[in-house]
C-alpha cells in the first residue's frame, strides 16, 4: 500500500461497525393490587432498552451484551409446564453476515477531490443507521442547533484503517522482557457457533417482560427439555440472543406457571429462531490477513460464550465480574465491602486470539437484612435511633428481595411509609370475591397470611411499589440484593484510602491477582461451557519484548540563557527547576488578586503568599510585578453567579481606572475549600468576561511550600503566553521548510443516569512551530451522547486560521489525534470526521497532508517487568517503553507506549492507532514523535502518559462540562421564590438544559487563542 493514499474500499458493502443483535426485553414489575406484603405483581413496561453493541464504548473490543441486563437467577414460582406449539420451519444455516458499519450504513457518496464525488446531504427521512450514531437525541435539539449534517460516504468508497508500513520499530536504548495480561485462546477454525434470536412474550404481548422473567422462562424451557436444549452447550446474553454449539429446535413453546398462594397463574410464549451460523474460520481469515473484513459478530458470539460461566458464579456489574468471597480486611465494617474482580475482552492480535483480563476493585453494599444494614451503616445500637431523613437518603433507589415469600424477585425501594408499621391499615380484598373488603393492619396481615410476627413496629415500612401504586413491606422482611455499588465518593477518609490501596496495587501484586483470576474455577477459563464450544484458554501470560526509547534533550533557561537538560532514565526521565527556569518567561504587569478566604477562620491565605509567589515566578524567569488590584471576599460569594460576575467586573473596572483601560492579564483566586462555585467562576470569567483566572486552595498551598508555588507559576506562565519547556532539537522527522500543526479532539459525555445533557466536544490545535507547545481551544456542544464530532471540519479550519494568525504561515502538514473512540468507531473517524475535515479544507483552497492517530486509554492491557532489572524503581515498566509485537493488531498500524513513570499502582500504557497517514511515518518515527511530545506538557516536569493534544482536549472538554453544570445551577437558582430547590430538583435542572443556548459554551474572544485551560 502506498502511504498517503486511501486503500480501495470494499465493493461488497461490508463496513467496520459491529452488529447489534439485541432487541426488546427489560422492564419492571407493576402491582395489580395495592400489593401489601409484597404480593404478586403484574408485568410493567420495561425501561431498559435491549440491543446489541453499537460501538458506544471506548477502548477494547466491545462486549456484545450489557451484563447489567442479565436476568437474576430464577425464583420459585410454581413448577410450571412447557408445551411445544406449532413448530416453525428451521432457518437454513447462513454464511456469516457482514455486520452493519458503525457510521457506514448511512449511504451517500464521497466528496469530489477529498476522495471522489460531492457529499450527499441526508434527506428528511430517517436513515436506518440513525440509532447507531445518535443515542437518545431529541429532534428539537438538532433543529434548534441547526447542526451541520454528517458527511456521508458511499459503501464502495469507504476507507479502512491503514496497514502497518513495516514490521514494527527497531530503535531502542535498551530492551526489556515483559509479561502482558493477554492469554491466548485456541479455537478450531472449522467450528461454527449457531446464533438464535429469542422472543419471550407474556399474556399481554404488548407488555415488555422483565429481565427476571426472561431468565426464568429461558431456564424453564431448557431444564424441561434438556435433550433438545442442553444448557452446557449454550450461552445466553440475558435478552434476545442465544449462542449454541449444537443445533437447537426452533419454534414456539408455551410456558405455564400454576397459581400458588404467593403467585397468580402465569403463561409465556417462548419463540426461538436461528438467524445466523457464525463461522470461526472467518475470524482466522481476518487475523491472518487473508480477509480485511472484521467478523465482529463472531467475536461477539465468542465473547458471550466466555462470559456465560462467570455470569452464573460471580456478581455481574456491567462487563465486569466480582467475587462473592471477601477477606476480613475487605470489610469496611459499616455494611460495605470491597470486592475484587476482573474485566475481560477478546482481541484479535498478532499472536492469535487473545483474552485480555485485568484486575479491579469495587465497593459494594453487603447482601444482608435491611435492618442489620442500617444498624451497621449508622452505627445504631437499636432501631430506636431511627432517623427518617437519613434512612431515606441511603435506601431510596436500592433493590431488595423479600424473605417472607419464596419468590426472589428484585424490587426497588421508592420511599418509606408516612406512618409507622403498627399504624398502617388497608382494605383487604378477597381474591375469590366471596367476602366484602375488610379493614386490616399490616401487623395482622403478616401474622395471619405468613405466620410472621413483626418486631420493629415503631419504624416505617419500605415502599416497593411502582407507577404510583404503594406496596408496603416491613423492613425486617427485606434483604438488600447483592452487587449494589457503593459510591466511592461517599466513603469516609479511612475507607477511601483503603479502597485506593486495594485498587492501586503494585505491579507484582496485580500480576499475581490476574493470574489467580484466570485460573480460578469461576473465571473465564473455568467451567465446561467454553470447552463445549471448542475454545481453550492458555492460562499463562504472554511474554513480550519491550523497547525503551531515548528521552529527548530539553531546552530550559538559566539566568537568561538557554541550557540543555538531559532527562535521566535513572530518575524516570523527570527533571527539576531548582536552579533553572522556563524557556520563555512571560511579562505580567497588570494582574489582580481575589482572596475569598479573608473572612475564614481557618485556611486563610498567608499574608506573605503573594510575595513568595512573585519571588518564585522571577526565579523561574517570569517578570511578575505586584498586583494592581487586591480584593477580598467571602467563600459564600461563590454560591451566587450574579455576585461572582459583579465581583469580577469590579476587578476589570478598577484595573482599567488605574492603568488607562488595561485589562488584568491574570486574576489569582484564593479559596479555602473546594466549592461548586469554582465552576461558576470559570464559566463567567471564560465565556462572559474574557478573564484568565488561576485558582488555588490555601491549605495545600501552605503545606506545599516552594514546590507548590513553582507548579502554580508554571500554570500561570502558560496561561499568559509563556513557554515552560521545549525540545532542544525539535521534531527530527519534519523538514526545515515544513509548517506543522498538531490537533487534538475529544468528546465528553454526560453521566450514565443523565438522559438529556449535551455531549461536549473539545478541539485544540498548536499555535507555534517548531516548538508546538502553545494551543488554542474550541468548545462545542452537540446532541446527548453523540460521539461523532459534528462540524469537525469547521472547528479544525478555525484553528488553522488561528495558527496562521499567530505564525504567518499555513501548515502544510497536520497530525490529528483523536481521543475516546473504540475500535468499532474507527470507521466513523475515517469516513465521517476526516472526510468532513478534508472537504472543509478543500472548499477553502487548502490541501495539507493529514495523518490521523487515535489514542486509547480505556483498555485493559497492562505490562509487567519479567525481572527487577527490566523495571523501574517502583516495579513498573520504564518510561518510554513501547510494545509493537504479539499483542497488537495482526497487521494494522498500532502500538502501546508507556511514556510516563508509574509511581503508584501499575502503569497503564496508551494504545496508539494510526488510521490514516499521508505524512509517511515509519513505526520508529511515529513512536519517537509521540514520546517526545509527551515531554512538552506544560504543567509538570516529567513526561505525561498521554500525548498533549489529546490531554489538553480532554481538559477542555471537561471544562465545557463545567460550563454546562454552572449555567444549569444558575438557571435553577434564578427560579421564583418558593420554587423547589431540593437535591432532586437541582439534579433535574442540571439535566434539563439542552444545547439551544450556544453562548453557554462560546469562549470569549480574548481567550480563544490562550491556554486558559491548563
UniProtKB/Swiss-Prot annotation:
Q: Where is the composition biased (Basic and acidic residues)?
A: 1-15
MF terms (GO), sorted A to Z: mRNA binding; siRNA binding
- A single GO cellular-component term on record: cytosol
All copies of the Piwi domain together span 666-965
| Subunit description | Interacts with NERD.
The entry's family comment says:
Belongs to the argonaute family. Ago subfamily.
Q: What is this protein called?
A: Protein argonaute 2
What gene name is given for the protein in this entry? AGO2
